Amino acid sequence: METKGYHSRPEGLDMERRWGQVSQPVDRPSLGPAERTEENNYMEIVNVSCVSGAIPNNSTQGSSKEKQELLPCLQQDNTQSGILTSEIKTELEPKELSATVAESMGLYMDSVREADYAFEQHAQQGSLSPAKIYQNVEQLMKFYKENGHRSSTLSNVSRPSRSFLPDPGSAVNGGVMRAMVKSPILCHEKSPSVCSPLNMTSSVCSPAGINSVSSTTVRFGSFPVHSPITQGTPLTCSPTVDNRGSRSHSPAHASNVGSPLSSPLSSMKSPISSPPSHCSVKSPVSSPNNVTLRSCVSSPANINNSRCSVSSPSKANNRSTLSSPAASTVGSICSPNAFSYPASGASVGSSATRDVIPSPDTHEKGAHEVPFPKTEEVENAISNGVTGQLNIVQYIKPEPDGAFSSSCLGGNSKIHSDSPFSSVPIKQESTKHSCSGASFKGNPTVNPFPFMDGSYFSFMDDKDYYSLSGILGPPVPGFEGNCEGTGFPMGIKQEPDYGIYYPEASIPSSAIVGVNSGGQSFHYRIGAQGTISLSRSARDQSFQHLSSFPPVNTLVESWKSHGDLSARKIDGYPVLEYIPENVSSSTLRSVSTGSSRPSKICLVCGDGASGCHYGVVTCGSCKVFFKRAVEGQHNYLCAGRNDCIIDKIRRKNCPACRLQKCLQAGMNLGARKSKKLGKLKGLHEEQPQQPPPPQSPEEGTTYIAPAKEPSVNTALVPQLSSISRALTPSPVMVLENIEPEIVYAGYDSSKPDTAENLLSTLNRLAGKQMIQVVKWAKVLPGFKNLPLEDQITLIQYSRMCLSSFALSWRSYKHTNSQFFYFAPDLVFNEEKMHQSAMYELCQGMHQISLQFVRLQFTFEEYTFMEVLLLLSTIPKDGLKSQAAFEEMRANYIKELRKMVTKCPNNSGQSWQGFYQLTKFLDSMHDLVSDLLEFCFYTFRELQALKVEFPAMLVEIISDQLPKVESGNAKPLYFHRK
């Protein structure tokens, strides 16, 4: 894999200038013809083959066979295009090597003296003398002399993934080291790390196969040194040499601080470089097969380490990172194809490496990104100078696209939850095994919503429950958490379960109250006026279980009996009143609802209603408006389309639409008088009466009931008998009380106002009104004395006359004859008159309505004229009981005349007023003839016109049609034409 270095030490710039002045001849191995150009400055991809063993410190005198086994075999893979070298000459002449190392060490010591100020505070145990360094150099030279003339080749042989721990005896001279290897990571220019060609976990391998990774904290003596990547030091250090700040080694045991040693063919000025090395700018010494890095030096067969990693052929010691073939206590030894992740090496010491995280901004063009887990904390404990069993408590969250099937922290590592170094996990995955060979044993997840006995109590026999779940809703799906002691998860706010607060044995099952899914509510009101509201479901017919409620005072006393009950619990539960057992449901419901919201609203504007005014529940504002609009005879006009919105805010914008809505709601001035009459009638009905004596037609229908024994009310009203005579209903009062009710047309405003729809609506309304007329006629005084056939004939002939007369009266009373008030939900304006295909007939009816305005008809006059219209049309042949009909009609004419003469407004003009009324009745016949003609036409063409007729209307028209067309109907006029 491509790797690049990152030069982070400022002293590297100065060392570059110094080493640029040094010139040393270096032998270059032969390259291929195509590989000898200086333009081959590109990164080489190398696979590392590491030996799992480690060379002890005193193994330099071993046999050549053993040393050959410990050296890596680097073989060239001709199949990969990224490898340039074929055969590499790894040895240098002893004289040249010693001279080069001598000069290098001289310059190195100068740089160390300059950098001493940065480490004086920490250098208590780890300082080394130059003599010791040269001693190590001499050992390195001996090692190379014995292992000379051995060529190493690069190899990319794939092997099974595995990680190696160094031998416990690899701790030499009691050196204490801590290391952690963390890989694989990508190598980038800004924050390079080390990766093998096949995404190996080991970052660097020296010729002896010992790998190390930078970006960890290493304790040298008493101080840690941190690498530029993650505030942690590079990884390994030779056990015998603890050199400060050395970052690179030449191929022949040279140690240097941040000095880039480059080959003569490199673009750098540094003098020492292996022949095929094409170093980038500021890159350190590169071996013949080195993959160039900016701040990395490798041995002749080295694969580049991370920023501060050095791989040396001999045991040249380095504080930053060093992988030596002789002896090393590097944390992990990994084979070239050991792709297990992460390779964690044994460390010597007790301090912990912290926050080993790769740089986040590493992404090189063309490089395959490998996710790297975040390690929170690693604790490595090795006792008695020997690498022991890893005791790592680490939580790793691999990325979703990670290509790693397992995270390996060591073959024998096991996680112990009771470890003194246990760390609190920031994020814990639900996987059973986070690491191969290591299982995390945490607290088992507990259901956050346990069903606790004593917390959910049954309410009644129907098994309705008052529970927290009913109030707060169902649990959060998929919620997981731990519930220990009195702690609860974040899903819901839950009070601790105090045994003293909810004693299971002492409190009855109906003590806990709330709101359940069935709609039942049981509320405690704060204060002395505590009440309980209970709304039962529809299936409960009675409150037979209400007596099962214990007295609330008993419940409160049971709570108060516990002295250790906290005050904050008692604050929300004051003393409540006792609820009687025989309380009714209506009382409970009325008390609980209260008067927070008005129970009635105005049917006109939607404001709060103040009462029933003019027959409709309205507010005071609409009451006054309607009275002034009707009595003042104002001709309001709408500026829009007579469809303005009338509500509490906009009710004053359009008086025309407001008046129309008042009329649609059913308001009329006559309802006020009817209300007063109803009160008087109710008072009169309290007195027991005998049936009236039989009367002859000459005696009339007016009578006074004789007073009988006083009722209970006589104690309050001693003179009730005399008052009852005065309050005996007159014919006028009787007619006002039996007046037909106003019916609704059932008009559907969502349908278009076509002629068919409007006529069908009017026919349905006429059928409803006909039913009311029949009911009215049955209770009409004297009408029941007529034979049934005469009653039916009179109703059939007078049907159209009665409906048109009632329409004119409603229009006069509700709209002052401005609109046609067919029904509260069907009011015709000029536009709808045209749409109904009966505009001319509407104009004729409008003239009748205007006569009401001109003559100022009263409701009493209207009631008598209505009866006379019922008796105004008979067959030519007469009725079966013609005498009874004539007598009845004459009596009502007399009563109308008496009423007109007694009216104070008509004093002196009583006969003139009576004449106008009778002339008006005669004019109704001319209008009715035109209406009947139109009605019969639509009835014949109902299939073609698609006009609907109700069943009752069909029956009446079918019987009336042949009689009228044959001329059998005879209208009765008051005045001759």
UniProtKB/Swiss-Prot annotation:
Q: Where is the composition biased (Basic and acidic residues)?
A: 1-19
Biased composition, class Low complexity, residue ranges: 259-288
Q: List every stretch annotated Important for coactivator binding.
A: 775-778
Q: Which residues bind DNA?
A: 602-667
Q: Which GO molecular-function terms appear in the entry?
A: DNA-binding transcription factor activity; sequence-specific DNA binding; steroid binding; zinc ion binding
Q: Where, by residue number, does aldosterone bind?
A: N763, Q769, R810, T938
* Compositionally biased intervals (Polar residues): 231-243
Q: What is its main location?
A: cytoplasm
Domain characteristics, as noted in the entry: Composed of three domains: a modulating N-terminal domain, a DNA-binding domain and a C-terminal ligand-binding domain.
| Protein name per the record | Mineralocorticoid receptor
